[in-house]
Amino acid sequence: MHNQHTMYESFHKFSLSYWQLLLIAVTSDGRILATGSYDTTVMVWAVSRVRGSEKRVKTTQAELPRKDYVIVETPFHILCGHDDIITCLFVSVELDVVISGSKDGTCVFHTLREGRYVRSLRHPSGSALSKLVASRHGRIVLYSDDDLSLHLYSINGKHIATSESNGRLNCVQLSGCGEFLACAGDQGQIIVRSMNSLEVVKRYNGIGKIITSLTVTPEECFLAGTKDGSLLVYSIENPQLQKASLPRNLKSKVSATG
């Protein structure tokens, strides 16, 4: 997370105003950055670490070394295929794929290495795509605020399942193992679904507040931020989901900050 943030800061300084970017996605190894822009294109950039002396970041307790990142000023791919702005983006070295979703209701696949067009998916009702996630197992989920539904596909474009989200989703995150999808939004709950069928595996009740951000920790805990500034921490109580040893009954509101 820190590496991605640092890369974005460096990238932001020299390119954001020029390219008018909407969003970014970074590969798991941090070496490739994909960006979506208002002009309906996706650009793919190489990332490298700055060599030489390390900068140091001051904290309240100590100084920590920080490595900066350099994004090559010219993208090595400019990918086309959409008729409207890019709304969601995924890039993976392991799958050799760049997947982009758009307000035009399409999801377009390109190869990462060659930048070659592979296929397009269209939302079942043509709705603008709001979010997409893809697992390393080759499963893709599309979500639209217009129909409030999740749509599961294989990497080859085969439709597998559809399920209503039962409310507007602000966050969709994969578990570390890639087999489960955590969804949260206006209802204030975290709902965990199978990436094989979209079946609900577990439901975590919140505190009646809209959840605006969600992350899954390496220990497979959920950290959820609410609209009023609260931070909620959940352990994964289902043995099927739990991939690491966690303290029991860790299910509490940790802080409330504005």
Please name every model-derived segment.
Residues 1-2, 42-47, 107-112, 150-154, ...:
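WD40-repeat beta-propellers
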Residues 4, 10-16, 54-59, 66-70, ...:
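Short C-terminal beta-strands that terminate individual repeats in beta-propeller domains
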Residues 19-26, 84-91, 126-134, 167-174, ...:
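Canonical WD40 repeat/beta-propeller blade segments in eukaryotic WD-repeat proteins
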Residues 30, 95, 138, 178, ...:
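Conserved loop/turn motif of beta-propeller repeat scaffolds
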Residues 36-39, 101-104, 144-147, 184-187, ...:
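Conserved strand-to-loop turn within each blade of WD40 beta-propeller repeats
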Residues 50, 73, 115, 157-158, ...:
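Short coil/turn linkers that define WD40 beta-propeller blade boundaries
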Residues 51-67, 74, 203, 208-212, ...:
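Terminal intrinsically disordered, low-complexity extensions flanking WD-repeat/beta-propeller proteins
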